Amino acid sequence: MGKWTGKKVAVLYGGRSSEREVSLRTGAACADALRARGHDVTLVDVDAELPARLRELRVDVAFVALHGRWGEDGCVQGLLECMGIPYTGSGVTASAMGMDKTVSKAIFKALGLDVIEYRAFPPARAAEIDLRDLPFGVPCVVKPAGEGSSVGVQIVKDAARLADACREAARYKGDVVVERYVKGTEVNVAVLEGKALGAIEIAPANEFYDYAAKYTAGTTRYYYPARIPEAHASRVMAAAEAAHRGLGCSGVTRVDFIVAPDGTPFILEVNTLPGMTATSLVPKIAAGLGLAFPELCERILDGAALKA
């Protein structure tokens, strides 16, 4: 029996971010899983009426299944703190830092983790960015600092495409981040309650693990455990735990890496509300350990608390 059995659980999903469709799938899957464990669950699509809706439902605890802005960035977490409703996942500060790639990269460097060389530019400068601003040149990776699910991310191989890619990234929230391109093995680590569960390797059909590759079944191959030497796997899982701890995260996170051929685990980001759909990586890793999806969701729910 879970900690919140018999209590009113609201699964918060949807919202207004560019990742709304993914959140709808995550929320529906988690709600079904929690119901299978005997919980009283109501799905709540997040909009401006959220405070009134939570009061009307007399919610005891919130399972946060949002992705992107206004959900993964500390906004909803702050509201829940003010309303005194315990919730899953990380608190306000950890969520905000994890969502902003410029801020999180600075923290990772301070923690002594391996960070790919990068430059960050305000959106107003996007149209002016050229190779003179980049000591590492091309190829490079351009991404918006405040989006997830690879939204707005492009690999630039031709200097003539750099300005267009930067302008595209500037359409989204936050700085424009340009990283040196590092060829290696893409590895994601699931961390639950501060402990790394395992590392999964991502092998997309195309060069880049983009939005379509993440959420379209059959477009990507996954290998669990990751096909990297044991020593490299140990390094990447230790780095994931350090990043989770360093940002002050709670509950479950997914930490993304590029592992270079020499074993250097270059950290890309910490996802404080990772996807929980049929194609998502945290459930795949948990399943590899024998932890079924309903039990995983209940473990996450059991960790719900006020963090402020």
From Swiss-Prot:
Position of the signal peptide: none
Lineage: Bacteria, Pseudomonadati, Myxococcota, Myxococcia, Myxococcales
GO cellular component, one term: cytoplasm
Keywords: ATP-binding, Cell shape, Cell wall biogenesis/degradation, Cytoplasm, Ligase, Magnesium, Manganese, Metal-binding, Nucleotide-binding, Peptidoglycan synthesis
NCBIfam families: D_ala_D_alaTIGR, PRK01372.1
Primary localization class, coarse: cytoplasm
Listed pathway(s): Cell wall biogenesis; peptidoglycan biosynthesis
Name of this protein: D-alanine--D-alanine ligase
Single GO molecular function: D-alanine-D-alanine ligase activity
UniProt organism field: Anaeromyxobacter sp. (strain Fw109-5)
Any one Pfam family match given in the protein's UniProt record, by short name: Dala_Dala_lig_C
Its job: Cell wall formation.
Binding site for ATP: 133-188
Domain called ATP-grasp: residue spans: 105-302
